[in-house]
Amino acid sequence: MAKRIMQGVVVSDKMDKTVVVLVERKVRHPLYGKIVRQSKKYKAHDEENQYRTGDMVMIQESRPLSKDKNWVVTERTAVAVEG
């Protein structure tokens, strides 16, 4: 089975070797047909602690690394703007 890949924003980098990534997707409401945004947070492995809050990253599904962590950060697509 192919590993899923998602894009999201790092919302927390306070843990060692772990970041929390917020992934948003658009879904059509089953009854009313309106497009609504759904978001979910994923814990992802960050081996070198190189990703910071606000970075746009790609995460890929992996084997379970801990109780809550099943994803690995593969690349940074946009750097956070400091200010």
Swiss-Prot record:
Keyword flag Ligase: no
An example Gene Ontology biological process: translation
Keywords, sorted A to Z: Ribonucleoprotein, Ribosomal protein, RNA-binding, rRNA-binding
Cellular component aspect of the GO annotation: cytosolic small ribosomal subunit
Domain of life: Bacteria
GO MF assignments: rRNA binding; structural constituent of ribosome
A Pfam family per the record: Ribosomal_S17
Matching PROSITE patterns: RIBOSOMAL_S17
Keyword Cell division in record: no
Membrane spanning residue stretches: none
NCBIfam families, per the entry: PRK05610.1, uS17_bact
PANTHER family reported for this sequence: 40S RIBOSOMAL PROTEIN S11 FAMILY MEMBER, SMALL RIBOSOMAL SUBUNIT PROTEIN US17M
Family: Belongs to the universal ribosomal protein uS17 family.
Function description: One of the primary rRNA binding proteins, it binds specifically to the 5'-end of 16S ribosomal RNA.
HAMAP family cross-referenced by the UniProt entry: Ribosomal_uS17_B (MF_01345_B)
Subunit structure as annotated in this protein's UniProt entry: Part of the 30S ribosomal subunit.
Protein name per UniProt: Small ribosomal subunit protein uS17
